[in-house]
């Protein structure tokens, strides 16, 4: 069993006694110090000997003595020597006060105070809050074993290795305190060792963790996210550190605290604790956890939890703005050393795109670093994080202008699971800044659909191919070989195909909803709409009602489209895939081209004819089969079929039939007028040609001469041909008696009729 040392070794923890070396013992005994006293911004030593060393650390002054400091600090020894050499001109150099400035000392005045207390032989209380700063200060002051045995570097290293790294909570607190100690904490491997310790404990079996961590709400452990102070004395330190049991029960463990009597913590017990870390330290922890082989879905859940704390805009209901209750503000207030990264994500809902970018210009570097770091550590496996989280992260990355390579990688990950997306997450504004830009980034959605199709094709190819690089199967039973039987392989391929079709259908519905939403934008060009609508294959949509709704919305928002553009727009949908309600709406839609309306009506007529044919065939088959008398009666006529349809169908069909009858009446009227005009032309031609072979009149002879010269006769013949082409459309109905018969038609008219009909056809 290994557990927090604050409870098992509380009497020895944190108390650093006077050094065991004899080099400075006589100086410490002569000083007769009673401790340090602070006055305003200065520290003094309670001693009978006057101070001869002034150390300035920032804006704090320390009035000390030379010999206790130079006996344990190599850097202090050199600094005092250089200061004394500068005062050689004075008569009594030994009595002069040496002034040493250490403005760049890691840990600041607090760490130097502890180092000075240690140099004077006072007991120093080591805690998880001050150990990292004191370790860096000891390295800065060069308090090595060469100066004195058991020096400060040795003791702080021992405390880190045997106390801090064995405790979960202390490792978190020390790593949090390292935020203000760069690059010293990095160079001394404190960050690496704490990250690996946290990763090792996070990957351990949860059954070895007692239910006593901050995520479960420890009672007296202090503020959540702050370091736990570990003081010497009894075992009542009150820390929130979890206890760990890696092999059976320990000797000092009570029955009440045995793992069998404790509830097993969930797999996400460590999410809340690591979420207080700064982004660079969180990346180090997650990287170490990946190396140790944790499940990618748990890693993705931890990243999502961390991002929801530091980037409130990534949650569905939270606004894209920081408040005073954000976790980074709590962490900086309860943590050690400051260094908390304050985030401010500005939403684009309150102003224009330029205002958003201007508001993000000041903290954009820190925000961009957080977003890019989260993108880089997100597991690449499918379903490691939700598609909604990826889309919201993509929105922030575009708004903050993250690295293009990371944005492209994030788009590919979204495309891998695009069928899981929601319309609200897909409506990403366009942050181009130009007035002609569309309200939403349509090009981004086009790229997401392309990534989705590429992923689908890759999965289909992998599922259908048997593996070219595999060795030939050995001559043994099939269940011993690593290959899948042909039947199983075919079943897997069919399952992959079915899943791909279902995913494409969901993406098609999502895309139709997206098109209906963005079609209201007047700046959306017809080309972009058409390309996005045709990005999916035809097999992805079983019904084009959603696409028709988007087309109708686009026509409503763009009333200035030409007839050619309307026809081009309507080509994106298939009239044969429209439902009955959509067909009835399209038949009465004045915004659609007339040709599309006719095509819709014809398609519906074909459907009705096919239904009648199938009903008749079913009736004949049922009548010929045995027991046909018991079969229900099937509709045999169109009237019977319409009587069995809903009332909405009958009303819509009646309106459409009324329009068709009106068109037929107008066509019959035009036929009658044409036949009347044709009769008058025949009568005029008879007058010109003469009757019964008599001598033509002078006027008729003149007209015949003009016909021979090809002057006015050509005009008559050209007019005749034009009218003949018009008669070509209705000649069959006129011949059948559907039109109005020409009044007074004689034998000559009947004789010349076939000739004129042939001319009209030619």
Swiss-Prot record:
Q: Taxonomic classification, please?
A: Eukaryota, Viridiplantae, Streptophyta, Embryophyta, Tracheophyta
Q: What is known of its domains?
A: The BTB/POZ domain mediates the interaction with some component of ubiquitin ligase complexes.
The BTB domain is annotated at 51-128
Q: Which residues form the NPH3 domain?
A: 268-607
Summary of the function given for this chain in its UniProt record: May act as a substrate-specific adapter of an E3 ubiquitin-protein ligase complex (CUL3-RBX1-BTB) which mediates the ubiquitination and subsequent proteasomal degradation of target proteins. Plays a role as signal transduction component in coleoptile phototropism and lateral translocation of auxin.
Fetch the CDD domains from UniProt: BTB_POZ_NPY3-like (cd18312)
User: Which residue spans adopt a coiled-coil conformation according to this UniProt entry?
Assistant: 654-691
Region feature Disordered, mapped onto this chain: 1-29, 227-264, 460-495, 687-718, 731-762
Which spans does this entry mark as compositional bias, Gly residues?
A: 227-238, 736-747
Q: Name one GO biological process term.
A: protein ubiquitination
Residue stretches of biased makeup (Basic residues): 752-762
Q: Name the InterPro entries on file.
A: NPH3/RPT2-like, NPH3_dom, SKP1/BTB/POZ_sf
Renumbered to this chain, the Low complexity biased-composition regions fall at: 696-709
**Domain of life of the native organism:** Eukaryota
Q: Which UniProt keywords apply?
A: Coiled coil, Ubl conjugation pathway
**This protein is called what?**
Coleoptile phototropism protein 1
Pathway, according to UniProt? Answer: Protein modification; protein ubiquitination
SUPFAM superfamilies, from UniProt? POZ domain
Compositional bias of kind Basic and acidic residues: 1-12
Q: Which organism is it from?
A: Oryza sativa subsp. japonica
Q: Which family does it belong to?
A: Belongs to the NPH3 family.
């Amino acid at each position: 069993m290994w557990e927090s040392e604050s409870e098992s070794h509380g009497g020895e923890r944190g108390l650093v006694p006077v050094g065991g070396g004899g080099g400075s013992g006589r100086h410490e005994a002569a000083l007769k110090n009673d401790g340090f006293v602070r006055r305003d911004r200065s520290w003094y030593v309670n001693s009978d000997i006057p101070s001869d060393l002034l150390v300035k650390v920032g804006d704090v002054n320390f009035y000390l003595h030379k010999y206790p400091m130079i006996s344990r600090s190599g850097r202090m020894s050199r600094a005092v020597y250089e200061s004394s050499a500068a005062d050689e001109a004075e008569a009594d150099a030994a009595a002069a006060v040496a002034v040493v400035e250490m403005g760049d000392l890691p840990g600041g005045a607090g760490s130097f105070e502890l180092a000075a207390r240690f140099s004077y032989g006072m007991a120093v209380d080591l805690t998880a809050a001050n150990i990292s700063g004191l370790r860096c200060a000891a390295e800065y002051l060069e308090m090595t074993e060469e100066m004195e045995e058991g020096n400060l570097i040795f003791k702080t290293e021992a405390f880190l290795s045997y106390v801090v790294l064995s405790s979960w909570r202390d490792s978190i607190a020390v790593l949090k305190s390292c935020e203000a100690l760069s690059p010293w904490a990095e160079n001394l491997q404190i960050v690496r060792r704490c990250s690996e310790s946290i990763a090792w404990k996070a990957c351990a079996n949860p059954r070895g963790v007692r239910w006593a961590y901050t995520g479960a709400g420890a009672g007296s452990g202090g503020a959540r996210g702050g370091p736990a102070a570990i003081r010497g004395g009894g075992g009542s330190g009150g820390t929130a550190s979890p206890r760990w049991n890696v092999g059976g029960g320990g000797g000092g463990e009570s029955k009440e605290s045995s793992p069998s009597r404790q509830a097993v913590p969930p797999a996400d017990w460590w999410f809340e604790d690591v979420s207080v870390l700064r982004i660079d330290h969180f990346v180090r922890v997650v990287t170490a956890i990946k190396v140790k082989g944790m499940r990618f879905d748990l890693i993705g859940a931890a990243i999502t939890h961390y991002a929801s704390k530091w980037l409130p805009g990534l949650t569905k209901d939270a606004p894209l703005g920081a408040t005073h209750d954000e976790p980074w503000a709590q962490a900086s207030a309860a943590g050690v050393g400051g260094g908390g990264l304050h985030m401010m994500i500005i939403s684009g809902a309150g102003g224009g795109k330029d205002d958003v970018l201007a508001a993000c210009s000041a903290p954009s570097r820190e925000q961009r670093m957080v977003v890019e770091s989260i993108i880089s550590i997100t597991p690449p496996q499918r379903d490691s994080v939700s598609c909604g989280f990826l889309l919201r992260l993509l929105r922030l990355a575009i708004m903050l202008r993250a690295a293009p390579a990371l944005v492209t990688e994030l788009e590919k990950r979204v495309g891998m699971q695009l069928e899981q997306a929601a319309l609200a997450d897909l409506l990403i504004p366009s942050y181009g800044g130009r007035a002609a830009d569309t309200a939403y980034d349509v090009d981004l959605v086009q790229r997401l659909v392309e990534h989705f199709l590429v992923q689908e094709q890759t999965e289909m190819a992998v599922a259908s191919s048997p593996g070219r690089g595999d060795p030939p199967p050995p001559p043994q039973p099939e269940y011993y070989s690593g290959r899948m039987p042909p039947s199983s392989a075919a079943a897997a391929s069919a399952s992959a195909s079915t899943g791909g079709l279902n995913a494409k259908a969901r993406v098609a519905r999502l895309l139709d909803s997206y098109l209906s939403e963005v079609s209201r934008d007047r700046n959306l060009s017809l080309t972009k709409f058409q390309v996005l609508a045709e990005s999916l294959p035809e097999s992805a949509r079983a019904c084009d009602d959603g696409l028709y709704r988007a087309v109708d919305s686009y026509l409503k928002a763009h009333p200035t489209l030409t007839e050619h553009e309307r026809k081009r727009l309507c080509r994106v949908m298939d009239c044969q895939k429209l439902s009955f309600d959509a067909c009835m709406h399209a038949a009465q839609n004045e915004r659609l081209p007339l040709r599309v309306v006719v095509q819709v009506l014809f398609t519906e007529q074909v459907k009705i004819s096919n239904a009648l044919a199938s009903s008749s065939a079913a009736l004949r088959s049922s009548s010929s089969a045995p027991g046909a008398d018991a079969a229900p009666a099937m509709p045999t006529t169109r009237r019977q079929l319409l009587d069995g349809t809903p009332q909405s169908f009958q009303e819509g069909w009646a309106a459409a039939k009324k329009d068709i009858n009106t068109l037929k009446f107008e066509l019959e009227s035009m036929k009658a007028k044409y036949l009347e005009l044709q009769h008058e032309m025949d009568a005029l031609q008879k007058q010109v040609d003469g009757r019964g072979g008599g001598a033509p009149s002078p006027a008729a002879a003149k007209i015949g001469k003009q016909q021979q010269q090809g002057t006015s006769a050509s005009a008559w013949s050209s007019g005749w041909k034009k009218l003949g082409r018009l008669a070509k459309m209705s000649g069959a109905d006129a011949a059948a008696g559907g039109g109005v018969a020409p009044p007074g038609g004689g034998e000559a008219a009947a004789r010349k009729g076939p000739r004129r009909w042939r001319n009209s056809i030619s």
